[in-house]
């Protein structure tokens, strides 16, 4: 008959062997767990660093050294506002600029001088032409945001064109820049149906450049712009003279001569 009696020494060896295997497997599990969590933590740290860098880029300031010399916040609350989307808001914006110079007018009264409807493709040129016919200087500005804000800080609203709409559909729209907040990095526009329409510096600059970076002042011949460019002012005076406003053009030249002394 087979002997099924247990050998104590053999049993002890078996138990010890099983215990060693169990400890070895547990050690492997612990190593794998540490490796997994170490890898996960490393990946998480990498993502956090990347997110931080992206956030820093996204939050980078658009305030230039020129802007830092301007007041923190300006709003020209007295600029008249005419609401409307017709003809890219061109007649409304021009009426606002003329009314700001004490001209009694409305957008409807400007349709005929602007040759609307029919001359929508010449709206930019005709808006400047009509402003000159009223005896005003049309002074073009540089394609830099700080140049526009400098004029607003001096009390002069800026007539401009920017691109408005969604990513799928955009169209140019005329507007009047009436204010800004340098701390919040926002501008205020009278545009279309919106009075005091707020846009971030970055969003506005992009929309403005998409529409050609066009911006002008409509000034009395006696009103020199802030940091006036003499050559540009004289060219504006020449354009005013060619529109039949020789006396106003002469006044503009005399104003410059007095202002640069």
What are these regions (language model features)?
Residues 7, 14-15, 33, 42:
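Serine/threonine-rich, low-complexity intrinsically disordered segments
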Residues 137-190:
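Active-site-adjacent substructure of cysteine-protease-like catalytic cores
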Residues 4, 9, 16, 24-25, ...:
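Low-complexity, intrinsically disordered or signal/transmembrane-proximal segments
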Residues 11-12, 30, 39, 53:
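Generic short N-terminal amphipathic or hydrophobic helices
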Residues 60-144, 148, 154, 223, ...:
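Cysteine-nucleophile protease catalytic domains, especially the papain-like/related folds used
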Residues 60-63, 181-261:
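Noncatalytic regulatory segments and standalone regulatory/sensor domains
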Residues 55-58:
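C-terminal motif of bacterial Sec signal peptides marking the signal peptidase cleavage site
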Residues 22-48:
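Bacterial N-terminal signal peptides that target proteins for export
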């Amino acid at each position: 008959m087979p002997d099924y009696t247990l050998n104590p020494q053999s049993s002890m060896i078996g138990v010890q062997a099983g215990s060693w295997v169990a400890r070895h497997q547990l050690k492997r599990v612990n190593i794998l767990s540490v490796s997994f969590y170490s890898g996960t933590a490393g990946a998480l740290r990498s993502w956090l660093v990347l997110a931080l860098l992206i956030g820093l880029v996204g939050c980078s300031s658009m305030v230039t050294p020129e802007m830092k010399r301007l007041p923190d916040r300006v709003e020209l609350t007295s600029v008249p506002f005419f609401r409307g989307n017709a003809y890219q808001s061109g007649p409304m914006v021009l009426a606002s600029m003329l009314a700001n110079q004490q001209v009694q007018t409305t957008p409807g009264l400007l349709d005929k001088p602007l040759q609307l409807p029919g001359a929508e493709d010449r709206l930019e040129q005709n808006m400047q032409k009509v402003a000159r016919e009223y005896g005003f200087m049309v002074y073009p500005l540089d394609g830099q945001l700080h140049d526009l804000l400098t004029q607003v800080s001096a009390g002069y609203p800026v007539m401009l064109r920017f691109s408005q709409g969604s990513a799928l559909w955009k169209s140019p729209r005329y507007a009047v820049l009436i204010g800004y907040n340098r701390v919040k990095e926002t501008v205020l526009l009278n545009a279309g149906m919106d009075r005091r329409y707020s846009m971030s510096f970055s969003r506005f600059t992009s929309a403005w450049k998409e529409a050609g970076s066009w911006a002008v002042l409509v000034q009395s011949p006696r009103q020199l712009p802030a940091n006036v460019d003499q050559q540009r002012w004289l060219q504006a005076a020449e354009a005013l003279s060619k529109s039949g406003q020789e006396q106003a053009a002469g006044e503009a030249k005399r104003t410059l001569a007095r202002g640069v002394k």
